[in-house]
């Protein structure tokens, strides 16, 4: 099978598993507790994902509950980022619905690539704030970081505050670019060109490559003369799924 075929088969298997898990409904009490024998206590995980309990009973799918519990564990323990230096100020704590930087290749690229300037950088799609943190630790004096998702902005703010870098990074809610130009514009977009099937998948899936195309279309209008745009990483899945070799 080609890479594109393998990708679609994997997505089909994921969708089948999701349908099964979505067919199992779990009743929740007004405080998010589960009134079933030997049920786990997932109240904190529910609160982190949905906000404070309202006191009303509700029902959730097993699929959604497993997703938010997994996100809670990542948020609790965090992810060590070697590019941020020595412990303890080198961990990123992802929130529910925000991509966890467990694969650090793209972070390493930002940490190692020569900087065109240390005056200003834009971080498009800030997510957890990991790339903004790396740029600030490398000496960039000011980073303007954007995201359209309030969850991501809250996550980035919490991480940057914990890393003692919030005074160097300005967070803005925006669809792609902030106003103005910068000598460096960095973007790590969702790299899978497919439809997200749950809130947590929006950090990975970009239907129609909307964000990727928007970044490329608007980059020149937001770069200073001689500036650089870093698209990290180039999506192998995107290339394979859309390639049309000519002979």
Where are these regions (language model features)?
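N-terminal auxiliary segments of SAM/dcSAM-dependent transferases
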Residues: 2-79
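Class I SAM-dependent transferase core
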Residues: 67-115
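Mobile active-site "lid"/loop adjacent to the S-adenosyl-L-methionine
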Residues: 189-214
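Conserved small/polar residues in nucleotide/adenosyl-binding loops
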Residues: 237-247
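Conserved RecA-like P-loop NTPase ATPase core
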Residues: 94, 160, 188, 215
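A short glycine-rich, Lys/Arg-flanked "PGG" loop and its adjoining helix->strand segment in the class I
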Residues: 213-225
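Conserved SAM/SAH cofactor-binding pocket of Class I
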Residues: 103-187, 193
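Conserved beta-strand signature within the Rossmann-like core of class I S-adenosyl-L-methionine
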Residues: 227-233
């Amino acid at each position: 099978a080609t890479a594109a075929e393998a990708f679609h088969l994997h997505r089909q298997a994921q969708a089948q598993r999701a349908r099964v898990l979505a067919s199992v409904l779990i009743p929740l009490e007004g405080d998010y507790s589960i009134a079933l024998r030997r049920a786990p206590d997932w109240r904190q995980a529910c609160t982190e994902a949905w906000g404070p309990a309202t006191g009303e009973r509700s029902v959730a799918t097993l699929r959604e509950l497993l997703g938010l519990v997994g996100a809670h564990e990542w948020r609790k323990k965090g992810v060590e980022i070697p590019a941020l230096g020595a412990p303890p100020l080198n961990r990123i704590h992802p929130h529910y619905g925000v991509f966890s930087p467990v694969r650090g290749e793209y972070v390493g690229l930002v940490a190692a690539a020569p900087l065109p300037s240390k005056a200003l950088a834009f971080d498009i799609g800030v997510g957890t704030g990991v790339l903004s943190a790396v740029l600030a630790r490398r000496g960039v004096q000011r980073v303007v970081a954007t995201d359209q998702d309030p969850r991501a902005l809250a996550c980035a703010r919490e991480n940057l505050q914990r890393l003692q870098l919030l005074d160097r990074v300005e967070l803005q809610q925006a669809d792609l670019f902030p106003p103005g130009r910068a000598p460096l514009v960095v973007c790590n977009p969702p790299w899978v060109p497919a439809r997200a099937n749950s809130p947590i998948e929006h950090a990975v899936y970009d239907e129609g490559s909307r964000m990727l195309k928007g970044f490329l279309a608007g980059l020149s209008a937001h770069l200073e003369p001689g500036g650089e745009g870093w698209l990290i990483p180039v999506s192998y899945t995107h290339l394979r799924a859309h390639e049309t070799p000519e002979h």
